[in-house]
């Protein structure tokens, strides 16, 4: 009778040493995200974080999101260094809509076989996103699950917790007819609409490496999502804001109504900005209707802010000084029950 072969976890497809190598690779990047409220070091069973002492009546705000099928393009073209920024942006931009300051972030990275270099690039991107949004990367999970993912595929999920003063929560209840709407420019498609983007690439037969205005098409598409947190926190310190809408999946039609009272509508001046070239390319090469563009993509607008009309000039000055591309995009008007909550003129 032959001696049974001794099996190891690695024989089953899980490489503990690779996981340890990943942790070593990311330690310096993670330390860059540190906040004074964080207690303990990376690697504990639970991550600890105190509430900042400046808050009198702190309310925690949480959010979770992913990067969607933008990951498919990143994996196919081996561009792993920016999808981590996307992950943090999708979560932290949602938190700032309530007026919340992001405190900490956790990530979940799942794959069939751990590619240490790719995972390192992803987590370093997550750390960069945390630096940009001012939150600490305090923990995460790397799951190597053979048989669950094909080849080099991986998936990401992010979890962010922030804090806001109870009396300063922004929930849209103060929005009134006559308020003005300010737009903050997007860096590209951000992290939404990529199933349609990939379909456009398929039916058009376009080469993702071809140039569009001096830049590879794939680089336009994988440009990381803009993080608006620090600029908007400064705006909130100095200006009265009634509502904010993060323009993500569902575009203008789905996201702006989420922060409006039922008796109000947003009237958007469609000629107040020019779409970035990538959106014109998608519309033309995919034969996509304008309505569908606005329902799927941000079309160059990553965030919309509602505020009193007499605060517009100061707000635009501040936001543009902070490096944002901000402009007046429309206003709030009274709405009848039969009307849509978003009009684009």
Swiss-Prot record:
Domain of life: Bacteria
Subcellular location: Cytoplasm
Pathway as given in its UniProt record: Purine metabolism; IMP biosynthesis via de novo pathway; 5-amino-1-(5-phospho-D-ribosyl)imidazole from N(2)-formyl-N(1)-(5-phospho-D-ribosyl)glycinamide: step 2/2
Cited InterPro entries: PurM-like_C_dom (IPR010918), PurM-like_C_sf (IPR036676), PurM-like_N (IPR016188), PurM-like_N_sf (IPR036921), PurM_cligase (IPR004733)
Reactions catalysed: 2-formamido-N(1)-(5-O-phospho-beta-D-ribosyl)acetamidine + ATP = 5-amino-1-(5-phospho-beta-D-ribosyl)imidazole + ADP + phosphate + H(+)
GO biological process terms, semicolon-separated: 'de novo' IMP biosynthetic process; adenine biosynthetic process
Keywords: ATP-binding, Cytoplasm, Ligase, Nucleotide-binding, Purine biosynthesis
Keyword Nucleotide-binding: yes
Primary location recorded for the protein, binned into one broad class: cytoplasm
Enzyme class per UniProt: ligase
EC identifiers of the protein: 6.3.3.1
GO molecular function, one term: phosphoribosylformylglycinamidine cyclo-ligase activity
GO cellular component assignments: cytosol
PANTHER family reported for this sequence: TRIFUNCTIONAL PURINE BIOSYNTHETIC PROTEIN ADENOSINE-3, TRIFUNCTIONAL PURINE BIOSYNTHETIC PROTEIN ADENOSINE-3-RELATED
NCBIfam families for this protein: purM
Family under the similarity heading: Belongs to the AIR synthase family.
Record-given protein name: Phosphoribosylformylglycinamidine cyclo-ligase
Organism: Shewanella woodyi (strain ATCC 51908 / MS32)
């Amino acid at each position: 009778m032959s001696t049974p072969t001794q099996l190891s976890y690695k024989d089953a497809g899980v490489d503990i040493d690779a996981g340890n190598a990943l942790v070593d690779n990311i330690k310096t990047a993670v330390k860059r995200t540190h906040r004074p409220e964080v207690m303990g070091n990376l690697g504990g069973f639970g991550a600890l974080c105190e509430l900042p002492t400046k808050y009198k009546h702190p309310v925690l705000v949480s959010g979770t999101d992913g990067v969607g099928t933008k990951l498919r393009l990143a994996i196919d073209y081996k561009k792993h260094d920016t999808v981590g920024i996307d992950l943090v942006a999708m979560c932290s931009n949602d938190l700032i809509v309530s007026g919340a300051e992001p405190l900490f972030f956790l990530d979940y990275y799942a794959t069939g076989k751990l590619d240490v270099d790719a995972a390192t690039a992803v987590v370093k991107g997550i750390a960069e996103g945390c630096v940009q949004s001012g939150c600490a990367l305090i923990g995460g999970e790397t799951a190597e699950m053979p048989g669950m993912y094909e080849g080099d595929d991986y998936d990401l999920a992010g979890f962010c917790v922030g804090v806001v003063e109870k009396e300063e929560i922004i929930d849209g209840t103060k929005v009134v007819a006559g308020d003005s709407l300010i737009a903050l420019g997007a860096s590209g498609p951000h992290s939404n609409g990529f199933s349609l983007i990939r379909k456009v690439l398929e039916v058009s037969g376009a080469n993702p490496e071809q140039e569009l205005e001096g830049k590879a098409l794939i680089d336009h598409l994988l440009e990381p999502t803009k993080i608006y947190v620090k600029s908007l926190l400064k705006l909130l310190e100095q200006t009265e804001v009634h509502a904010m809408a993060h323009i993500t999946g569902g575009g203008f039609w789905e996201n702006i109504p989420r922060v409006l009272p039922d008796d109000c509508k947003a009237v958007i001046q469609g000629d107040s900005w020019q779409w970035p070239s990538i959106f014109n390319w998608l519309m033309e090469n995919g034969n996509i209707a304008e309505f569908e563009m606005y329902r799927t993509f941000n079309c160059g607008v990553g965030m919309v802010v509602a505020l009193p009309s007499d605060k517009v000039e100061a707000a635009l000055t501040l936001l543009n000084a902070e490096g944002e591309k901000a402009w007046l995009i429309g206003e709030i008007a009274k709405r009848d029950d039969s009307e849509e909550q978003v009009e684009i003129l």
